[in-house]
From Swiss-Prot:
Originating species: Arthrobacter sp. (strain FB24)
Cross-referenced HAMAP family: Ribosomal_uL10
One GO BP annotation of this record: translation
Listed Low complexity bias regions: 164-196
UniProt keyword annotations, A-Z: Ribonucleoprotein, Ribosomal protein, RNA-binding, rRNA-binding
DNA-binding in keyword set: no
Record's protein name: Large ribosomal subunit protein uL10
Alphabetized InterPro entries for the sequence: Ribosomal_uL10 (IPR001790), Ribosomal_uL10-like_sf (IPR043141), Ribosomal_uL10_bac (IPR022973), Ribosomal_uL10_bac_type (IPR047865), Ribosomal_uL10_CS_bac (IPR002363)
Similarity comment: family membership: Belongs to the universal ribosomal protein uL10 family.
Encoding gene per record: rplJ
This protein's GO CC annotations: large ribosomal subunit
Length: 196
């Protein structure tokens, strides 16, 4: 008979599966509480790293339609429920597993597809979403910047051919007539003060 506590736990795990775009199943045998806390901090706020009961997790996974963990729920199990950037979370997990051999990445899923441990490592090797977006923005911006440079080069070439002063020389040329106007006004003012 299911107790209210177990029913609540299954509902919470089911909800975690449904809200996550990815999850990674790990075995944490031998990790200290301090190490688990360090791992949770490195994963960030968009990833929930939860120690789970295997039987309850199997029920919750079935209810959520996640088949990636079939046959993998054995031993001390913890799951990283990833709601944000799956690449960054997978990278944090694999980096932590490299320095803490007690954490074993068993399997995972990403956007409904089951992943084995090597595929989780391959996901971690991808560039982060922010870096990918920055590259796309750079690619989109490059043609406009190149066009602006070409237009500016053509303008400079035309100015040289026509003998017009370059844009940098234009302000100096404009200042000269203003200085001449000031000189012509100064003698007129001097003459007016002499007459008085």
């Amino acid at each position: 008979m299911a107790t209210p506590t177990k029913v609540s736990a299954v509902a919470e795990i089911t909800n975690d599966f449904k809200e996550s775009n990815a999850a990674v199943l790990t075995e944490y045998r031998g990790l200290t509480v301090a190490q688990l806390k360090q791992l949770r901090v490195s994963l960030g706020q968009d990833t929930k790293f939860a120690v789970v009961k295997n039987t309850l997790t199997a029920i919750a996974a079935k209810e959520a339609g996640v088949e990636a963990f079939d046959g993998q729920l054995a031993g001390p199990t913890a799951i990283a429920f990833i709601k944000g950037d799956a690449v960054a979370a997978a990278k944090s997990l694999t980096d932590f597993a490299k320095t803490n051999k007690q954490l074993v990445i068993k399997t995972g899923y990403f956007e409904g597809k089951a992943l084995n441990a090597s595929e989780v490592a391959a996901l971690a090797a991808l560039e982060s979403r922010e870096l990918q977006l920055a590259k796309v923005a750079g690619i989109l911006k490059a043609p406009a910047a190149a066009a602006a440079r070409i237009i500016d080069a053509l303008r400079l070439k035309l100015e040289e051919e026509n003998g017009a002063p370059a844009a940098a020389e234009a302000p100096a040329a404009e200042e000269a007539p203003a200085a001449e106007a000031a000189e012509t006004e100064a003698p007129a003012e001097a003459a007016a003060t002499e007459e008085n």
